[in-house]
């Protein structure tokens, strides 16, 4: 589809339907110009109306704030990205829905040095909000978090090697288990006999 007018989208839908049906007769759906629109995100300053020049000061503030929090900071990598999506859903009942989706990601990587040892930490926030998201408070939150995450790494010690019991709580532990052994239980790996568990299932 090279355009987003109703006529162009209907033409694309008909083409897709012909391909999917492979010549078989299917049920026709009549789409109307009526589209249901709901404001799901309370945006007061759309990103489309914000210039690059207006965004740069927040990157500069974040950079300066991180350097001011700890004299061990050697480098800061700050980034700000925004996007806006206009999505149109059409269902088999002939009803269409329009969705406006703003997105902003504001983040920083802090690199620190202590006694010749370098560490880095990351912090950021992503929201479906407009430019109103950019405040001095969010700058302070991200800066402090990036510095704290980096500073604590200098206190880290290497764990002992070998087998040991692991105690996991509810929540993210499921992801840890999946990444540790879950993939090896998947059918493809056992069918191809590339899994350690292929003879145990």
Model regions and ranges:
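Active-site bordering "gate/hinge" segments
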Residues: 1-201
């Amino acid at each position: 589809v090279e355009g987003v007018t109703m006529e162009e989208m209907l033409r694309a839908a008909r083409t897709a339907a012909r391909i999917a049906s492979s010549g078989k007769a299917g049920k026709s759906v009549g789409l109307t110009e009526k589209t249901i629109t709901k404001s799901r995100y309370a945006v007061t300053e759309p990103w489309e109306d914000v210039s690059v020049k207006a965004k740069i000061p927040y990157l500069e503030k974040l950079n300066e704030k991180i350097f001011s929090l700890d004299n061990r900071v050697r480098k800061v990598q700050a980034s700000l990205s925004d996007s806006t999506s206009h999505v149109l859903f059409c269902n088999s009942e002939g009803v269409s829905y329009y969705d406006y989706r703003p997105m902003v990601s504001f983040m920083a990587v802090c690199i620190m040095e202590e006694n010749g040892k370098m560490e880095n930490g990351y912090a950021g926030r992503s929201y479906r909000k407009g430019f109103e998201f950019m405040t001095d408070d969010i700058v302070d939150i991200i800066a402090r978090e990036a510095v704290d995450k980096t500073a604590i790494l200098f206190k880290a010690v290497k764990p002992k090697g070998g087998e040991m019991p692991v105690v996991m709580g509810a929540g993210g532990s499921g992801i840890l288990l999946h990444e540790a052994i879950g993939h090896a239980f998947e059918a493809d790996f056992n069918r191809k006999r590339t899994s350690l568990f292929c003879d145990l299932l």
